[in-house]
Amino acid sequence: MKKIIINGSFLCRNLTGIERFSLEICKRLDFLDKNNLFELYVPKDVQFIPELSNLKITISDSNLKKFPLWDHFTFPKYVRKQKSISLDFANLTSLFHPGLVFIHDIYAKLYPQDFTFPKDKLRRFYMCWMYNHAIKKGKHIFTVSEFSKNQIIETYKVDSKKITVIPNGWDHFKSIKEDESVLKAFPQLHKQKFYFTLGSLQKRKNLIWLVKYAKNHPEEIFAISGKAINGMVSNEISSLESLSNIVLLGYVSDEQVKALMKNCKAFIFPSYYEGFGIPPLEALSVGSKIVVSDIPCFKEIYKASAYYIDPNNPNVNLSDLLKTQVSSAEELLNYYTYDNAAKKLYNTLININQKI
């Protein structure tokens, strides 16, 4: 069988959604790869090199910053030289040597209205170009939910047999030790008395819902991590600082995020579009209640274990909502693990490899 070479460019970026997924899957492929069928090819300017036992790591002489040279020239050139197959985790595959590719969602294709500035429009054009190329020319497509799979099929008219669902997981959270210093740093945050959410610059994360809700409920406290304001267009978002019941935490570590999730009244994730949505899964793993948007993706993943809100309507009472009963999260936490995802991916890759 041919060797499968993984595009390690994700190691040059911060560990957010796709990057976290990529790293956790690689760690588990390393455990499964007893026959050295996989290799990780990384740019010279990686932020760190993971400790792997079986999965070979090769460091390139080139940096990632020469975008898009790495994805379309440097990486595929190495793959061709090794007479191997490429595996890309980040919504693209080489223009000239397409391989196996993960398309996590097709947000840029479906929500053009969210890309308003010239730079954003250019980025959207490139993303849509990559979606189309990867889906039409890639040897096989992987995505993270049945919802995303169906959207890809409907939008690009691709055969369902060409797409395999490999979901996200939460088990990386087990090795993170919570750091409650963040609670001491913000005296407004009393245990089980505040709501928590992750700030983001992406419009689809829908912080506008939380702003409107907070205005209507000054008695409730809301903690928001990350850079929730910079780069946003909406006047509602810019008003975050003026609301006394919103606590802007700034950057928080993974350890502090875990502490906030564990000690909040509920974790809120009001996105109006997601391909999967990992943070609510992380919150469930530490026993937190989760309030998520009533959208197809979340209904698929979280089923009856979540409290649902209309992402377009903040006229709800969260305290009353949280008094209702939801199902135990045990079954979905047992299912959505990176261990399970990596095993499914490994077996699928072996089968594909035998046919190429």
Residue ranges of predicted features:
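Carbohydrate transferase catalytic cores enriched for Leloir-type hexosyltransferases
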Residues: M1-I356
